[in-house]
Amino acid sequence: MVTVEDVRKAQRAEGPATVMAIGTATPPNCVDQSTYPDFYFRITNSEHKAELKEKFQRMCDKSMIKKRYMYLTEEILKENPSVCEYMAPSLDARQDMVVVEVPKLGKEAATKAIKEWGQPKSKITHLVFCTTSGVDMPGADYQLTKLLGLRPSVKRLMMYQQGCFAGGTVLRLAKDLAENNKGARVLVVCSEITAVTFRGPSDTHLDSLVGQALFGDGAAAIIVGADPVPEVEKPLFELVSAAQTILPDSDGAIDGHLREVGLTFHLLKDVPGLISKNIEKALTEAFQPLGISDWNSIFWIAHPGGPAILDQVELKLSLKPEKLRATRHVLSEYGNMSSACVLFILDEMRRKSAEEGLKTTGEGLEWGVLFGFGPGLTVETVVLHSLCT
């Protein structure tokens, strides 16, 4: 007689979840950060606000961002003047864009990841889709299933409105799905488009202006599975552990509200300070079981909320400047793409490691950390184990 224990054992994978492939995509429209303030104040009919424009120029100059990609072009914005005003009812116009474009951009990234993985898409058993750009029913997960031609029986999980920490969340969920379902191959997609948050400037809402200086569009996709098929699947990283926590005394530190005017964004406290103050505790809890306490001995993938967060984390932990190289590179080339950022950084790290002939995907090191920071203030901590390049 078969027992429940026997059934459970047969259902579970043997080894840890691994990242098997990564793909990324951006809209074609590239925006130069140095000239963006001119464009932004012109398109929003705000050129008379000279002092505010100077302030925004300084924000952009200090952002450490060279360029960003945006679905919103001058033509689209001219056709949708309500999106350009500071607080005009505009949710319908925004939704009409993102409901179509979020799955479309996700498809581009997913197609690249599936190609690298090298297996037929019929072998994808689960889909995790994450976006903070708009909501709809059936969701972006359903639309992507149709766009890619995945099996109708693919098990879908749709994550809306999570914000910037969710690149860590999707890895945590994909790990559990892959390890608890033998043979599972999880397609994870994060797709973010700033059409929901774009709006004109206001003297009284400077945190909105911070978002206008930092956010960019992008989608990233990964394939996660345990027990890779030898000679067929080439794992890049192992997902060793994953944790989520709400930081103490951080209520209202980062808020987003979906309203008639779109998604409004609020930074109410010292976010870089809160993160740097609590980051060592998260690291210690994650790495104590491995006997690791030297934060320069591991590789780093941190959500680049903005340069101030990275600077304070670096200072607090006495990190060598090269530790956040991949993170800063992605911030500089793409801006803050919310949940997709950490997956872009993962991609950048494994590519650069291979290019430089380093022995592992994690800059030649064995162990690493991936951090997501976002509304709550919520922190996701994922421990990674790199593999041979």
From Swiss-Prot:
A single MF term (Gene Ontology): identical protein binding
Keywords of the record: Acyltransferase, Transferase
Pathway this chain belongs to: Secondary metabolite biosynthesis; flavonoid biosynthesis
Regions annotated as coiled coil: none
Record: active site: C164, H303, N336
Gene Ontology terms: biological process: chalcone biosynthetic process; flavonoid biosynthetic process; polyketide biosynthetic process
Keyword Transferase: yes
Tissue and organ expression note: Mainly expressed in flowers, to a lower extent in young leaves, and barely in mature leaves and twigs.
Complex and partners: Homodimer.
Functional note: The primary product of this enzyme is 4,2',4',6'-tetrahydroxychalcone (also termed naringenin-chalcone or chalcone) which can under specific conditions spontaneously isomerize into naringenin.
Family note: Belongs to the thiolase-like superfamily. Chalcone/stilbene synthases family.
Protein name: Chalcone synthase
